[in-house]
Amino acid sequence: MRDPVEFYNSALVPMVVEQSSRGERAFDIYSRLLRERIIFLTGPVEDYSASLIVAQLLFLEAENPKKEISFYINSPGGVVTSGLSIYDTMQFIRCPVATLCVGQAASMGSLLLAAGEPGHRFALPNARIMVHQPSGGFQGQATDILIHAREIEALKRRLNEIYVKHTGRDYDTIELGLERDNFMTADAAREWGLIDEVLQKRAEASPAA
């Protein structure tokens, strides 16, 4: 059964009607923006939303492997493995991916923000960015709990290494910074190396990014 909140939210997605020589055609707003090579991540990162993002990235690469993709992020984070599937696809495809935080980029959202093309990672002035270490819970036999604890520790190390790669900070600094929930303004995120620039106004020569 479909989640009633999801159904309600989907019913609120605006439609865009375009006129052409072949008549009218209606698109939901996100599909229309996809034609402009704009992808949105809104809400939690989980398997379904990650699959949609990955599919859009692969589609846009197939259309034009050299043209930039604009990836807008407003997310509280979510499932680590789902986020890593998006991250790996961003690094895998040939298109440069510009990232822009609107609202918030927390947890896995901040990692995806930092993973954009160097020099093309942005946030709007009132965006909030948050980094922290992965969390999880497990119940079961003591041996299984230890197995899951080792897995979370391995994920923590891997996420730290990714932040090191994209921020230019050393591992110890990253590990300390992610020890607890670490909230930042857009300017602080720039100083931290998560983004390259805080955008006040869109450049006239840049219609999408």
From Swiss-Prot:
It is an enzyme of class 3 (hydrolase). It comes from the Bacteria. The active site is at 107 (nucleophile), 132. GO terms for biological process: protein quality control for misfolded or incompletely synthesized proteins. It is found in: Cytoplasm. Keywords: Cytoplasm, Hydrolase, Protease, Serine protease. One of its GO terms (molecular function) is serine-type endopeptidase activity. It catalyses: Hydrolysis of proteins to small peptides in the presence of ATP and magnesium. alpha-casein is the usual test substrate. In the absence of ATP, only oligopeptides shorter than five residues are hydrolyzed (such as succinyl-Leu-Tyr-|-NHMec, and Leu-Tyr-Leu-|-Tyr-Trp, in which cleavage of the -Tyr-|-Leu- and -Tyr-|-Trp bonds also occurs). GO terms for cellular component: cytoplasm; endopeptidase Clp complex. InterPro entries: ClpP (IPR001907), ClpP/crotonase-like_dom_sf (IPR029045), ClpP/TepA (IPR023562), ClpP_His_AS (IPR033135), ClpP_Ser_AS (IPR018215). The keyword Protease applies. Its EC number is 3.4.21.92. NCBIfam families: PRK00277.1, PRK12553.1. Fourteen ClpP subunits assemble into 2 heptameric rings which stack back to back to give a disk-like structure with a central cavity, resembling the structure of eukaryotic proteasomes. Belongs to the peptidase S14 family. Cleaves peptides in various proteins in a process that requires ATP hydrolysis. Has a chymotrypsin-like activity. Plays a major role in the degradation of misfolded proteins. This is ATP-dependent Clp protease proteolytic subunit. It comes from Methylobacterium nodulans (strain LMG 21967 / CNCM I-2342 / ORS 2060). The gene is clpP.
